[in-house]
Amino acid sequence: MEQKRLHFIDAIRAWAILMMLQGHFIDGLLAPQFRDQDQDWFQIWTYFRGITAPVFFTASGLIFTYLLLKNTHTTYVNKRIKKGLKRGVQLIVLGYLLRLNLQGLLNGHIYPSFFYVDVLHCIGLAILILIFAYKLIGYWSIKGFSIVVFALATLIFSFEPWFKGLDWSNWPVALSHYFTRENGALFTFIPWVGYSFYGAFMAVILVKLSHKKMFYPIAIIGLFILGTWLKYDSSRFFIFL
């Protein structure tokens, strides 16, 4: 039976897109004299601009995985997997096409910025990895799938400082962009895909528990407490790790 659509997922997706658009728009047009960190309004805007990318990545993993798991019928699952494979490849290709300088290409030159890795590349790769993890584990055990994606996300964030210190100079530049920002990439595969994996873990919880009577009040309160701790008192914990 088709499950009821969760409209708040659409709201999260819409919020992330709108925040991304306004963030780029204001950042591109705001004069330097108005970028005053002592102003409350600018601090608020900076904070929300800072969480836009994590929300966008988390929502992408949550939405894709929720749609994949909400119906266990084989025909539906295979359809979602095929669509996900297509979408993941499309996002990666589109990420490169958006960085392609047409005039330079007509002149027989491809600029280095063409190989920069951005949001679309990372989300596309995250979707492909989630599909692989589902086919490998989730098809047989949703619980096992949730453990794997949660563990992957946690490992990614735990070892990100060590990973950042690795030397990628011997790698082809086009590949190194996925792992380091030293050559100009804006987003890297690590740690950003970790947010998508946490989103996938949240999707499993939604699929399994969203029908429970007290799920949403408990989830909202729990996420509020977790978010407050992450914002104000998580630094010491991660430094300890």
Residue ranges of model-derived segments:
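Alpha-helical transmembrane segments and their immediate juxtamembrane cytosolic regions
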Residues: 1-241
